[in-house]
C-alpha cells in the first residue's frame, strides 16, 4: 500500500508525537509498504485558518499518490485530511492523541478535574472550544476508522461523540526493550513535561514542598529537554513523577519502565491499570495522596519495595507490531 502519514510534528522537532510518526513510517516501510510523512509543524508560524488551508494544499500534492491516509491527530492535521481525502475519495483513519478540547477548557477556566468528568455535565464553552468540538465531530464522522491508544479514551469518546462502535479500534502504544540504568546519586524526582494545566503543576509543587519538610534531601527536576537528554537523565534518576489530571497514554512513564525506575502516575490514566503492578498510582486531585506517594518513595523501605516492583516489568511491544496492526486495518477500509 501507498500510505500517507499526516502528523503535527516530525523530526528534527522533538516530542512524543514526532517520535511516534517517524517510527510508524519506518516500520510501515520495513513491512514492504510505501510510506511518506507530511507534517503540519513548519506551518505553525502562520495564523489559524491560514495554516490549515496551506496544509490542505500541501496534502493535495500527495493525494494523487496515496492509497490510504493516517491522520495522527483529530483537529490540526485531521480536518485538512478529511477535506482532501473527500475530494479524492481516499480512505483515511484518524488516531486520537490527547483530548484537545478538554485541555483548552482547563487552560481557559483554571478548573482542574480529570478527563472522565469533562463530558458528564453541561459546560459553557468558548467560541474556540465550540469550534474544536464541531471540528472533532466532523473528523470522527468522516474517518473510515478511529484509532485509540487506550480503552479508557475510547469509552469516553464513544459516549461523548456518539461514535459508531464498529469504527472504533484500539492500537496500544509501543513499549520498547529494557535500557540499562545507573544507580542514582541523589533523590531526584523527574518531571520533564510541557507545563500545561492538565499536568497539575500547582498540586504537584505544593505536595512536593510538603514532602520536602519531612525529606529535605528530595529534589524536583523539571522543564523540557530533547529526548536524548531526557533518556540520560532518566537513566540515572531516583524516580519519575507524573501526577497529571489524566495522561491518556504517557510515554514518559513507559520510558521510566524501560529504565526500570520507580514512578508515580495518575490513577485516571488510560494505562493506569496496565502499569499499576509496577508503580504507584495517585489521585491527582488529592494533594495528600501525592504527598504520601512521594514520601513513600523517599523512604529507604518504600524505595526498595518500588524497585522490586518495577524490576518485574517485562512487557515489550514494538513499532513493527503497531505498523502491522495499522496495515491490517487499512486493508479493510
Kindly label every feature range from the protein language model.
Residues 4, 147, 174, 181-199, ...:
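Conserved donor-binding/catalytic core segment of Leloir-type glycosyltransferases
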Residues 280-287, 296-301:
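Conserved acidic donor-binding segment of nucleotide-sugar-dependent glycosyltransferases
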Amino acid at each position: 500500500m501507498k500510505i500517507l502519514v499526516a502528523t503535527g510534528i516530525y523530526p528534527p522537532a522533538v516530542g512524543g508525537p514526532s517520535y511516534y510518526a517517524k517510527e510508524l513510517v519506518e516500520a510501515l516501510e520495513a513491512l514492504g509498504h510505501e510510506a511518506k510523512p507530511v507534517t503540519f509543524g513548519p506551518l505553525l508560524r502562520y495564523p489559524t485558518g491560514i495554516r490549515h488551508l496551506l496544509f490542505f494544499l500541501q496534502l493535495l500534492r500527495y493525494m494523487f499518490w496515496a492509497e490510504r491516509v493516517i491522520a495522527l491527530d483529530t483537529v490540526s492535521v485531521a480536518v485538512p485530511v478529511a477535506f482532501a481525502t473527500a475530494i479524492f475519495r481516499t480512505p483515511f483513519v484518524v488516531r486520537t492523541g490527547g483530548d484537545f478540547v478538554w485541555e483548552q477548557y482547563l487552560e481557559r477556566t483554571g478548573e482542574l478535574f480529570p478527563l472522565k468528568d469533562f463530558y458528564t455535565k453541561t459546560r459553557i464553552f468558548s467560541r474556540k472550544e465550540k469550534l474544536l468540538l464541531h471540528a472533532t465531530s466532523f473528523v470522527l464522522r468522516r474517518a473510515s476508522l478511529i484509532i485509540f491508544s487506550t480503552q479508557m479514551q475510547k469509552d469516553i469518546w464513544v459516549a461523548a461523540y456518539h461514535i459508531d462502535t464498529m469504527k472504533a479500534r484500539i492500537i496500544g502504544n509501543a513499549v520498547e526493550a529494557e535500557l540499562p540504568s545507573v544507580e542514582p546519586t541523589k533523590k531526584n524526582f523527574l518531571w520533564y513535561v510541557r507545563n500545561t494545566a492538565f499536568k497539575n503543576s500547582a498540586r504537584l509543587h505544593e505536595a512536593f514542598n510538603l514532602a520536602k519538610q519531612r525529606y529535605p534531601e528530595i529534589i524536583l527536576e523539571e522543564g523540557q529537554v530533547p529526548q536524548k537528554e531526557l533518556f540520560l537523565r532518566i537513566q540515572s534518576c531516583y524516580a519519575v513523577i507524573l501526577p497529571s489530571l489524566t495522561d491518556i497514554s504517557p510515554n514518559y512513564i513507559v520510558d521510566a519502565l524501560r529504565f526500570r525506575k520507580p514512578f508515580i502516575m495518575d490513577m485516571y490514566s488510560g494505562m493506569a491499570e496496565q502499569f499499576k503492578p509496577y508503580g504507584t498510582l495517585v489521585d491527582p486531585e488529592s494533594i495528600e495522596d501525592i504527598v504520601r506517594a512521594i514520601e513513600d518513595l523517599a523512604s529507604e523501605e518504600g524505595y526498595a519495595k518500588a524497585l522490586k516492583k518495577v524490576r518485574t516489568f517485562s512487557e515489550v511491544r514494538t513499532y513493527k507490531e503497531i505498523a502491522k496492526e495499522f496495515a491490517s486495518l487499512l486493508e479493510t477500509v
